[in-house]
C-alpha cells in the first residue's frame, strides 16, 4: 500500500507543473516519461483529434512506419476514431486487437505485446486518450489504478491548459480589434495592401511602392505600421534601401482586416 501511495503522489505531482512547462511543442513529454518510469512501460498521450501531445518509449516496440506517427505528431484517423469510442479503460489488449498499438508487421516479433488505453475526459468533455504498452508483461490491477489516476490528472491539466489558451486567444483577438479600430480609413487601406504583400506571416515590402499603387502618402503607411507595432501585432525592421522587413505576430489581423472589406 505504501508503495502504491508513493507512486500515486508522483503522478498527482503533475498538477504542480506550471503553464510555462506546457508550452513546448510536445507539452506532455515530461509527464509521459514520469508515467512510463512509474509503471515501467511505453506511454503516449493524444488529443481527441489524434495530435500527439507527448510520448516516451522505454522499450523498442515499433517499426519505422509507426515511429513516423510519432515524428509527424499525428496518429491515423481510423486509430483515433477507435480510441475515441473507448469510454472506459481497456486493459491488456493483445497484438491481434484492432486497437493494439503494435503494428501488424511487428506482431510476430512481439507476440505477447499488450496495449492499455484509458480515455481522458473531464466534465463530460472528451479530451484525448492515454495509451500505454509493454512487450510481454501484463498490466496488473495496481498499474491500472495508476493509469486511471494518471488519465484524470492529465485531463484536469489539459482542461486548465485549454482554458488558458482560450483566454489568450480572446486577449489576442481583442488586441487586434482595438488596434484596427484606431486606424483611419486610409491606414486600413494601407494595412490591407501591406498584408497582401507578405509571403505568409512575414516578408519584405517597400512603403513608397505600396503608397504609389493605392494612392496614399508614405506617411500613412508608416503611421499604420507604428500603431500595429505598438499593439504587439507586428514587428518590423528597416532594411535600408531594400525596404522594410515585416513579421505578423498575431495572425488574427488578417481576418480582422478582411472583415472590414479593405
From Swiss-Prot:
It is found in: Cytoplasm. It comes from the Bacteria. Its main location: cytoplasm. Residues 207-226 bind DNA. Pfam families: CodY, HTH_CodY. InterPro entries: ArsR-like_HTH, CodY, GAF-like_dom_sf, GTP_trans_reg_CodY_C, Transc_reg_CodY_N, WH-like_DNA-bd_sf, WH_DNA-bd_sf. Keywords: Cytoplasm, DNA-binding, Repressor, Transcription, Transcription regulation. One of its GO terms (cellular component) is cytoplasm. Transmembrane segments: none annotated. One of its GO terms (biological process) is negative regulation of DNA-templated transcription. Residues 1-159 are annotated as: GAF domain. Belongs to the CodY family. This is Global transcriptional regulator CodY. It comes from Streptococcus pneumoniae serotype 4 (strain ATCC BAA-334 / TIGR4). The gene is codY.
Amino acid at each position: 500500500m505504501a508503495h502504491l501511495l508513493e507512486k500515486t503522489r508522483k503522478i498527482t505531482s503533475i498538477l504542480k507543473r506550471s503553464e510555462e512547462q506546457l508550452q513546448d511543442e510536445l507539452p506532455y513529454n515530461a509527464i509521459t516519461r514520469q508515467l512510463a518510469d512509474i509503471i515501467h512501460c511505453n506511454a503516449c498521450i493524444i488529443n481527441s483529434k489524434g495530435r500527439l501531445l507527448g510520448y516516451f518509449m522505454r522499450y523498442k516496440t515499433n517499426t519505422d512506419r509507426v515511429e513516423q506517427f510519432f515524428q509527424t505528431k499525428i496518429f491515423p484517423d481510423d486509430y483515433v476514431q477507435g480510441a475515441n469510442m473507448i469510454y472506459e479503460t481497456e486493459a491488456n489488449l493483445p497484438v491481434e486487437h484492432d486497437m493494439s498499438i503494435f503494428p501488424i508487421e511487428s506482431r510476430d516479433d512481439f507476440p505477447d505485446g499488450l496495449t492499455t488505453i484509458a480515455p481522458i475526459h473531464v466534465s463530460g468533455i472528451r479530451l484525448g486518450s492515454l495509451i500505454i504498452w509493454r512487450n510481454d508483461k501484463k498490466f496488473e490491477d495496481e498499474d491500472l489504478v495508476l493509469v486511471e489516476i494518471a488519465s484524470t490528472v492529465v485531463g484536469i491539466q489539459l482542461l486548465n491548459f485549454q482554458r488558458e489558451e482560450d483566454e489568450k486567444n480572446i486577449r489576442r483577438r481583442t488586441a487586434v480589434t482595438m488596434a484596427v479600430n484606431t486606424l483611419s480609413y486610409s491606414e486600413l487601406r494601407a494595412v490591407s495592401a501591406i498584408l497582401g504583400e507578405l509571403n505568409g506571416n512575414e516578408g519584405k515590402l517597400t512603403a513608397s511602392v505600396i503608397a504609389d499603387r493605392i494612392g496614399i502618402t508614405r506617411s500613412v503607411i508608416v503611421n499604420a505600421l507604428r500603431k500595429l507595432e505598438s499593439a504587439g501585432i507586428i514587428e518590423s525592421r528597416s532594411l535600408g534601401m531594400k525596404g522594410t522587413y515585416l513579421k505578423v505576430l498575431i495572425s488574427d489581423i488578417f481576418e480582422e482586416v478582411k472583415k472590414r472589406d479593405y
